[in-house]
Amino acid sequence: MKKPTLLIVFLTVFIDVVGFSIIFPLFPAMLDYYLKLDGKESLIGSLVAWLDQFAGGDTNAVATLFGGVVGSLYGFLQFVFAPIWGAYSDRHGRRPTLIFTLGGIVLANLIWVFAGSFALLVLGRALGGIMAGNISTASAVAADITSGKNRASGMILIGVALGLGFILGPAIGGFAYSWQLVEAGEAAT
């Protein structure tokens, strides 16, 4: 078992999941921020009007639906691109695929953190979902570098990275918001 490679696999999955989940506690504040910034006649204004039809005027329900829509975009694209990145890594190698997609995740997170409009937030989340399809490639790397009797350890490492990412991502997002570290969007505009 190659421990440095497994560490890279762990970090890839962990960073992917933190990037996915860090935004969860920020959705209500982002809804207010981008609605004020872009206005009711914008993309976000149209989305809020559409969600309001389902929520019956309940502001909390609109914020919840907003989080669901924006959050599911990432997950949907991750689902669609997982087999694409898997096939790409079979042809071009696991390492270049992981390096490229991890760089894409970092870029995607920077885009949404500094987004000066809702459209840029959506672009960042979409790019993140596309690049996060690399979790299947990371799992393949773990399987490739572990022998049959050690393969369970490699898969457990993937599970631990997923679990820790889902635990720490929302916590980091919540703390960043409570400490007012998430005013980067306002600084970028």
Regions found by a protein language model. Name each.
Residues 3-46:
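Pair of pore-lining "gating" transmembrane helices in MFS-fold secondary transporters
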Residues 14, 108, 119-133:
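Hydrophobic core of transmembrane alpha-helices in multi-pass small-molecule transporters
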Residues 71-83, 133, 166-167:
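Residue-level signature of mid-helix packing/kink "hotspots" within the transmembrane helices
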Residues 158-189:
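Helix-loop-helix hairpin linking two adjacent transmembrane segments in secondary transporters
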Residues 71, 75, 102, 153-163:
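Small-residue-rich transmembrane alpha-helices and their cytosolic helix-loop interfaces
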Residues 79-118:
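Conserved MFS/SLC helix-loop-helix module at the cytosolic interface between two early adjacent transmembrane helices
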Residues 124-162:
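Cytoplasmic helix-loop-helix junction between adjacent transmembrane helices
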